[in-house]
From Swiss-Prot:
GO molecular-function terms, A-Z: ATP binding; ATP hydrolysis activity; peptidase activity; proteasome-activating activity
Nucleotide-binding among keywords: yes
Assigned keywords, A-Z: ATP-binding, Chaperone, Cytoplasm, Nucleotide-binding
Protein name: ATP-dependent protease ATPase subunit HslU
Functional note: ATPase subunit of a proteasome-like degradation complex; this subunit has chaperone activity. The binding of ATP and its subsequent hydrolysis by HslU are essential for unfolding of protein substrates subsequently hydrolyzed by HslV. HslU recognizes the N-terminal part of its protein substrates and unfolds these before they are guided to HslV for hydrolysis.
A cellular-component GO term for this protein: HslUV protease complex
Binding residues annotated for ATP, in chain numbering: 18, 60-65, 256, 321, 393
Organism, as annotated: Azoarcus sp. (strain BH72)
Similarity section: Belongs to the ClpX chaperone family. HslU subfamily.
InterPro entries: AAA+_ATPase, ATP-dep_Clp_protease_ClpX, ATPase_AAA_core, Clp_ATPase_C, HslU, P-loop_NTPase
Biological process, per Gene Ontology: protein unfolding; proteolysis involved in protein catabolic process
């Protein structure tokens, strides 16, 4: 779990997301509260439950990006799911319990990777020993009663040094490695994903004990053997126990597109039980016990962050019980021209920098003037206002259209430099931006 303070978390998010200070502050406080709660003694600690967050705002303003960046900062089990993928129990589709099962799988995978990193050096030493045993086999005994003669340690150390310096990387050796687990694709009715996983696990375990001889370059052999040795050194039971504890105490679930399961009060017609999905989410968000193949998981202290554009519905269209489970509400603002400018220039991997790097591979020096960037931001904002407002995603469309010609011609003789100023932007985009009918289809 991260030990960053709320200002530090917001500062990290600022490197990738423009504006939306209130949303960043809310998720930073929620993340820090997980750390604070862990330092409180029982029985008070078990009484402190996370305050779930509902983020409301138009598409393309940073809701999903906040979730993506938060996942990297959290250092805790994290899963992002779309609410539209789930249906009420009894309908065709996935039921909401699979969210927690998937979260457990993610936590165990992350835990195993961390454990393998801890024993990596020991595993590499063991892998080197196995390769050296192949390169320098023990001398054959003269009689049956005499033991095998070990190789001179000085020779072994000399070969180990060559091995570590990469001098033997391309030499091929024949080694005995565990055979790859049997891959069996099993199709089962919706709602039976756990049974499917158990059957697949059974088939995979059938082939785990088998070993086979393979001829490989030493570079690849070392990697395979190191992975095999690391898997032997870690304690799977400890990994699973720690993963289950981390999910229960520090797990974070990001529910995207939650507005799509909010049925409008004035809506009528076919509906695959949107309210049913909401009712199924209720116990999950409030706190219940979910059965997984690794054990029972309590969801009482899992943090839920929901987000939605709420274009066609309102937060009040959610059933009242679910509304009450998200006490913290944050509204994200639409992007202004200034925001578009900052997205193009001030984030760590801004679009202008990405295109400069892409075209540099073909020997084209691309540069943007401040006036050109301002004009780009104005056009993106205008098109959003005149047609559908898709937020920052409009910049992808505008930039692709702007640089279409140079991207196509890059690599040809004479195409080695381009400066994007206001005049160039107008020449390429102004006609399209002014004609609403064209902008609707092209931009």
């Amino acid at each position: 779990m991260t030990q960053m303070t709320p200002p530090e978390i917001v500062s990290e998010l600022d490197k990738h997301i423009v504006g939306q200070a209130r949303a960043k502050k809310a998720v930073a406080i929620a993340l820090r509260n997980r750390w604070r709660r862990a330092r409180i003694d029982e029985p008070l600690r078990s009484e402190i439950t996370p305050k779930n967050i509902l983020m409301i705002g138009p598409t393309g303003v940073g809701k999903t990006e906040i979730a993506r960046r938060l996942a990297r900062l959290a250092n805790a089990p994290f899963i992002k799911v779309e609410a539209t993928k789930f249906t009420e129990v009894g309908y065709v589709g996935r039921d909401v319990d699979t969210i927690i099962r998937d979260l457990v799988e993610i936590a165990i995978k992350d835990g195993r990777e961390r454990a393998m990193r801890v024993v990596r050096d020991r595993a590499l030493d063991a892998a080197e020993d196995r390769v050296l045993d192949v390169l320098l086999p023990p001398a054959r005994p003269v009689g049956f009663s005499e033991p095998a003669q070990p190789q001179d340690s000085a020779t072994r150390q000399k070969f180990r040094k060559k091995l570590r310096e990469g001098e033997l990387d391309d030499k091929e050796v024949e080694i005995e490695v565990a055979s790859a687990p049997m891959q069996a694709e099993i199709f089962a009715p919706p709602g039976m994903e756990e049974l499917t996983q158990q059957i697949q696990g059974m088939f995979q375990n059938l082939g785990n004990s088998r070993k086979k001889l393979r001829k490989l370059p030493i570079r690849e052999a070392l990697k395979l053997l190191a992975d095999e040795e690391a898997a032997r050194l870690i304690n799977d039971e400890e990994v699973k126990t720690e993963a289950l504890r981390a999910v229960e105490q520090n797990g974070i679930v990001f529910l995207d597109e939650v507005d799509k399961i909010a049925a409008r009060a004035d809506a009528h017609g076919a509906d695959v039980s949107r309210q049913g999905v909401q009712r199924d989410l209720l116990p999950l968000v409030e706190g219940t016990t979910i059965s997984t193949k690794y054990g029972m998981i309590k969801t009482d202290h899992i943090l839920f962050i929901a987000s939605g554009a709420f274009h066609l519905s309102k937060p009040s269209d959610l059933i009242p019980e679910l509304q009450g489970r998200f006490p913290i509400r944050v509204e994200l603002e639409s992007l202004s021209v200034e925001d578009f400018e900052r997205i193009l220039t001030s984030t760590d991997a801004c679009l202008t920098r990405q295109y400069e790097a892409l075209l540099a591979t073909d020997g084209v020096t691309l540069s943007f003037t401040p006036e050109g960037i301002r004009r780009l931001a104005e056009i993106a904002y205008q098109v959003n206002e005149k047609t559908e407002n898709i937020g920052a995603r409009r910049l992808y469309t505008v930039m692709e259209k702007l640089l279409e010609e140079v991207s196509f011609e890059a690599g040809k003789v004479g195409v080695d430099k381009l400066t994007v100023d206001a005049a160039y932007v107008d020449a390429r985009l102004e006609v399209l931006a002014q004609r609403e009918d064209l902008a609707r289809y092209v931009l």
